[in-house]
C-alpha cells in the first residue's frame, strides 16, 4: 500500500460528500467532538497541566483518529468532505518521516520525532514568529536570533509593509514582500556566519502567490520549509492545496500549522486537543506534511501560555509520542513582550511542557505578534530552558509542578499584559546584542529558576 496520491486528494475535493459549511461546523465538528470527548473520558485539569496518565494520552489519540476518519477535511471551495479510510490514515502515519536531515555544512541539523520514554535532544526553531514587521525592523531583529548558538533553525515572521506600501492579501505586493523577506533572511544568515542554517519562510503572503514567487534557488532553496495551515476546524481551500502541490513538487518541506481554537467549534481544551490530533493525521496526506505544528489558540488570549493551551498541547504531544511518533513542533507564543519578567515566565512554562511531551519549541511570538516587541534573548531563554529540561532529565511530575507554579504567576495578567519594549530599546541595533539592563533581568531570572526549581539555565 502507498500513501494516498495527491492527485487522488484533489479528485476527492470534487467527488466527496457534499455538505454545507455550517452543517460541517455544527453537525460534524462540534457534535462529533463533544461525543468523542465524553466517550473517551478526556478531561482537563488545572492541577495537571502536564499529565502523567498514559491512558488519557492514548484515549486522545484514538479519539483524534476516529474524528479524522469520520469528518475528513472540508474543502471550502467545493463544499465537499475529503474523506479517508482508517487504513489510509494509519498508513499515512506509518509512512510519515521520523527524522529529517536539514541545513548544510556546519549548520546541518537532524530534526527527530519524539518517542515516548526516549530522551531526544531539543531542536530549537527560533525567530520572531508570527510578527508582521517593517523592512527595517525585520532586518534589525533577525540578526539577534541567528546569533544565538543554541538556535538550530530560523523562522522570522513577515513583512507587512514594502517600500512604504501596505501588503494586501492577493495583491502583487505579496510577491514582492515574500521575495524581499527571503532576501533579508539569506543576507542575515551570511552576515552572521551561518549560511547553511535551515529556515521556514515565505510568511509575507497569506495566499499562494508568495510561496510560488519564492520557489527558486535564489530565494528558497529546496530542503527548507514553509507553512501550510489547516483552516479552523479541519478545513482546506484551493490556496492551501496550491501551496502544498507547488512545494511538494519543488522540494521544500510542508509544515502543517494547526491552531485549533479553544472555545470555538471544537469546544474546550479537550476538544481542541482531539481536533489537533485529527488535523495532524489528515495533514500527513492532504498537506504532505513532514512536520506538524501545534498552536492551541485560546479564543480570548491567542497565546499558548494560558493553562488550557498548555494542557492541550501536552496531550497532543504525548498522544503521538506514545502511539505513532511524527515530527511535531509547538508555538511558544506569549502575551507579554520582550524586556519583561512576565515573558520569561511564560516562555519557561510553555517550553518545559513542550520539552517533556514531544513538541520541539518554535518561537518566540512575543505579544502574540501584535507589536514588534521581541528579541533574540527571548529565544535564548526558550533554548536554555529546553536544554536544561533535557540535561536534568526532568520527570513529567516534576515538570508539572514547575509549570503549574509559573502559570500562577502570570495567568491573571492576560487582559492587560505587559507588552514590554520595542527591539531598539532592549538591543543595540548596530551590534545586535542585548542591552545590559535586559541581560541583568535575565540573569536574575536564571538565578531564580536555579534556586526555586533546580533548573540550570
Please report, for each region that a protein language model flagged, where it lies by residue.
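Metallocofactor- and cofactor-centric catalytic cores in central/energy metabolism, strongly enriched
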Residues: 1-214, 230-236, 372, 404-408, ...
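Helix N-terminus capping/helix-initiation residues
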Residues: 53, 85, 267-269, 375, ...
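Secondary-structure junction/capping motif
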Residues: 55, 62-63, 67-69, 267-269, ...
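Helix-rich catalytic cores of soluble enzyme domains
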Residues: 124-356, 360, 369-372, 380-387
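Gly/Ser/Thr/Ala-enriched C-terminal appendages of enzymes
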Residues: 350-361, 367-457
Amino acid at each position: 500500500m502507498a500513501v494516498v496520491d495527491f492527485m487522488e486528494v484533489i479528485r476527492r475535493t470534487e467527488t466527496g460528500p457534499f455538505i454545507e459549511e455550517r452543517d460541517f461546523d455544527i453537525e460534524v465538528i462540534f457534535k462529533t467532538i463533544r461525543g468523542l470527548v465524553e466517550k473517551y473520558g478526556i478531561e482537563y485539569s488545572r492541577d495537571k497541566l502536564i499529565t502523567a496518565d498514559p491512558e488519557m494520552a492514548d484515549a486522545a489519540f484514538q479519539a483524534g483518529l476516529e474524528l479524522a476518519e469520520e469528518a475528513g477535511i472540508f474543502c471550502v471551495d467545493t463544499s465537499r468532505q475529503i474523506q479517508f479510510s482508517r487504513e489510509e490514515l494509519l498508513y499515512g502515519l506509518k509512512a510519515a518521516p521520523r527524522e529529517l536531515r536539514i541545513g548544510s555544512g556546519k549548520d546541518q541539523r537532524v530534526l527527530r520525532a519524539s518517542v515516548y520514554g526516549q530522551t531526544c535532544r531539543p531542536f530549537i526553531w527560533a525567530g520572531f514568529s508570527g510578527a508582521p514587521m517593517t523592512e527595517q525592523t525585520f532586518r534589525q531583529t533577525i540578526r539577534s536570533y541567528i546569533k544565538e548558538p543554541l538556535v538550530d533553525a530560523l523562522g522570522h515572521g513577515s513583512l507587512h509593509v514594502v517600500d512604504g506600501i501596505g501588503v494586501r492579501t492577493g495583491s502583487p505586493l505579496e510577491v514582492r514582500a515574500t521575495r524581499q523577506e527571503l532576501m533579508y533572511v539569506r543576507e542575515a544568515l551570511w552576515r552572521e556566519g551561518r549560511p547553511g542554517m535551515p529556515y521556514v519562510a515565505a510568511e509575507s503572503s497569506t495566499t499562494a502567490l508568495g510561496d510560488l514567487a519564492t520557489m527558486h534557488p535564489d530565494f528558497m532553496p529546496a530542503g527548507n520549509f514553509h507553512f501550510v495551515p489547516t483552516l479552523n476546524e479541519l478545513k482546506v481551500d484551493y490556496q492551501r492545496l496550491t501551496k502544498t502541490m507547488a512545494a511538494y513538487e519543488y522540494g521544500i518541506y510542508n509544515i502543517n500549522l494547526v491552531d485549533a481554537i479553544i472555545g470555538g467549534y471544537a469546544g474546550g481544551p479537550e476538544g481542541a486537543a482531539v481536533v489537533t490530533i485529527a488535523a495532524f493525521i489528515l495533514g500527513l496526506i492532504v498537506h504532505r506534511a513532514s512536520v506538524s505544528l501545534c498552536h492551541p489558540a485560546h479564543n480570548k488570549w491567542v497565546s499558548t501560555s494560558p493553562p488550557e493551551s498548555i494542557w492541550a498541547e501536552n496531550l497532543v504531544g504525548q498522544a503521538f509520542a506514545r502511539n505513532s511518533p511524527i515530527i511535531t513542533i509547538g508555538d511558544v507564543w506569549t502575551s507579554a513582550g520582550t524586556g519583561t519578567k512576565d515573558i520569561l515566565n511564560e516562555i519557561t512554562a510553555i517550553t518545559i511542557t513542550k520539552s517533556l511531551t514531544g513538541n520541539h519549541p518554535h518561537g518566540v511570538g512575543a505579544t502574540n505578534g501584535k507589536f514588534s516587541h521581541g528579541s533574540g534573548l527571548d529565544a535564548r531563554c526558550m533554548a536554555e530552558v529546553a536544554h536544561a529540561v533535557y540535561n536534568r532529565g526532568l520527570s513529567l511530575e516534576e515538570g508539572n509542578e514547575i509549570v503549574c507554579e509559573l502559570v500562577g504567576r502570570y495567568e491573571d495578567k492576560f487582559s492587560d499584559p505587559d507588552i514590554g519594549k520595542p527591539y531598539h530599546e532592549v538591543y543595540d541595533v548596530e551590534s545586535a546584542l542585548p542591552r545590559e539592563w535586559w541581560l541583568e533581568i535575565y540573569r536574575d531570572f536564571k538565578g531564580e529558576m536555579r534556586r526555586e526549581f533546580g533548573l540550570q539555565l
